[in-house]
């Protein structure tokens, strides 16, 4: 196995273990800690911290520590959050959620920088296009990473599975499910009893163990990017001054392409929050019961994982524009269905089909967005990925902010609007890229013609 691919698999498996723990724990926050809104407050604090972290920390940590040790250090923040859940209260969850948020942006920026650099080095080595290898590496990563949703939800479903004591769902409650949910209908009663402390400790022990294994895997087996560059004969760049690094995230906004593309990560945050927050609560839990949430999310994660690998493979044949068109078409269709559909207990397959379709489209945003930012901003990868996480965090914060007081139908219309803006911005950037490429090609042809003319005269 080639060394670059081995490194990609190490990063992927590390993230798989880490987010098997974090993803499962995140989905249970609002259910386990509903008293005085502690769970929702924890998630809101977490993503606000991610937003602040995205502005400053990623370029600094990556420049000072390198991609490998930035990933290791950031993973430690996730494990601390898991430990904080063993004695859950305002004094443990809020500080540890802030710490996790501070580590999240550097973690993802380092991952994006690492995979992009590895892809470009491998492309030079084998004589392929850099964007094709980068797309392939992101496809492999998200195939492995997205399966964490399967394992995380499966673990929680198995641990809490014996507790399911389903009650009949009243017809009055079904009438307020779906897009009609305006937080004024009857409260969902078809939930399980609160799990015992022993079961919670069992689950947290498994999740914490997964996080520790992730740290050890990356620390021991991942090759340092700086060592890799030296081995490939690349010169290690001299670190820029601290203030230059601090400002690099914001200075990149002078590139109009970034301004146009920021709606893509913004929409990514919106759509992820909708599925995990609104779909699971207003559709699945409301109509089927909370014990079905894990299984529906497994379907989503499995489809996202499989499609991530598929898109990474076929992008060099179809081009990224076709994949973005596919992703947008699927989400447009799903949003329309969500607006018109009245969920019912007799329509069980529909819940899984819609979850799977949402996963097909989510795979486009996850693989292509990361590859797009890595390819377009190759010279400024760290600030580019920091801005990507900033946009995604803003999407999460806004969506969590209005989640408690807007009807689901209104949230769907907002989602539709942001998706439209994202596609317009992306389409404009593609047009600018084609236009710039044609200018370069025209200039090369002109120079070639002039050279031939000079040779003829001689």
From Swiss-Prot:
It is found in: Cell membrane. Gene3D superfamilies: MFS general substrate transporter like domains. Glycans are attached at residue 190. CDD domains: MFS_unc93A_like. It comes from the Eukaryota. It is a multi-pass membrane protein. The chain crosses the membrane at residues 8-28, 42-62, 69-89, 90-110, 140-160, 202-222, 258-275, 286-306, 321-341, 345-365, 390-410, 412-432. Keywords: Cell membrane, Glycoprotein, Membrane, Transmembrane, Transmembrane helix. Signal peptide: none annotated. InterPro entries: Ion_channel_UNC-93, MFS_trans_sf, UNC-93_regulatory. It holds the Pfam family UNC-93. One of its GO terms (cellular component) is plasma membrane. Belongs to the unc-93 family. PANTHER family: PROTEIN UNC-93 HOMOLOG A (PTHR19444:SF13), UNC-93 RELATED (PTHR19444). This is Protein unc-93 homolog A.
């Amino acid at each position: 196995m080639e060394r670059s691919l081995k490194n990609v698999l190490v990063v992927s498996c590390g993230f798989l273990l880490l987010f098997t723990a974090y993803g499962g724990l995140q989905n249970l926050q609002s259910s386990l800690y509903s008293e005085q809104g502690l769970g929702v407050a924890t998630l809101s604090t977490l993503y606000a911290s991610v937003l602040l972290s995205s502005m400053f920390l990623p370029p600094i940590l990556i420049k000072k520590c390198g991609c490998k040790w930035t990933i290791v250090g950031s993973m430690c923040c996730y494990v601390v959050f898991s430990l904080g859940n063993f004695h859950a209260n305002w004094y443990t969850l809020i500080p540890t959620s802030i710490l996790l948020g501070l580590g999240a942006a550097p973690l993802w920026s380092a991952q994006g920088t690492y995979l992009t650099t590895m892809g470009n080095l491998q492309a030079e080595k084998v004589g392929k296009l850099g964007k094709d290898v980068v797309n392939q590496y992101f496809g492999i990563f998200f195939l492995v990473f997205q399966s964490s949703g399967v394992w995380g939800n499966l673990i929680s479903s198995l641990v809490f599975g014996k507790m399911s004591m389903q009650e009949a769902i009243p017809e009055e409650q079904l009438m307020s499910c779906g897009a009609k949910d305006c937080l004024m209908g009857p409260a969902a009663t078809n939930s399980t009893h609160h799990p015992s402390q022993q079961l919670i400790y069992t689950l947290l022990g498994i999740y914490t163990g997964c996080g520790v294994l992730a740290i050890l895997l990356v620390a021991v087996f991942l090759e340092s990017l700086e060592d890799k560059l030296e081995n490939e004969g690349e010169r290690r760049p001299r670190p820029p001054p601290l203030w230059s690094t601090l400002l690099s995230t914001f200075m990149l906004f002078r590139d109009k392409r970034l301004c146009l593309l920021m709606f893509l990560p913004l929409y990514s945050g919106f759509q992820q929050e909708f599925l995990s927050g609104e779909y699971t609560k207003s559709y699945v839990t409301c109509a089927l019961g909370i014990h079905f949430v894990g299984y529906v999310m497994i379907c989503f994660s499995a489809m996202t994982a499989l499609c991530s690998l598929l898109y990474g493979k076929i992008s060099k044949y179809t081009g990224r524009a076709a994949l973005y068109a596919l992703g947008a078409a699927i989400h447009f269709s799903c949003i329309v269905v969500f607006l018109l559909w009245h969920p019912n207990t007799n329509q069980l397959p529909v819940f899984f089909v819609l979850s799977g379709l949402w996963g097909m489209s989510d795979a486009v945003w996850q693989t292509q967005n990361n590859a797009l930012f890595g390819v377009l901003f190759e010279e400024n990868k760290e600030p580019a990925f920091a801005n990507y996480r900033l946009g995604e965090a803003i999407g999460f914060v806004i969506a969590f902010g209005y989640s408690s007081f807007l009807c689901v139908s209104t949230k769907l219309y907002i989602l539709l609007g942001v998706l439209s803006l994202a596609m317009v911005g992306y389409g404009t950037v593609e047009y600018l890229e084609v236009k710039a490429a044609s200018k370069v090609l025209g200039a090369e042809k002109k120079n070639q013609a002039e050279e031939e003319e000079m040779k003829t005269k001689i």
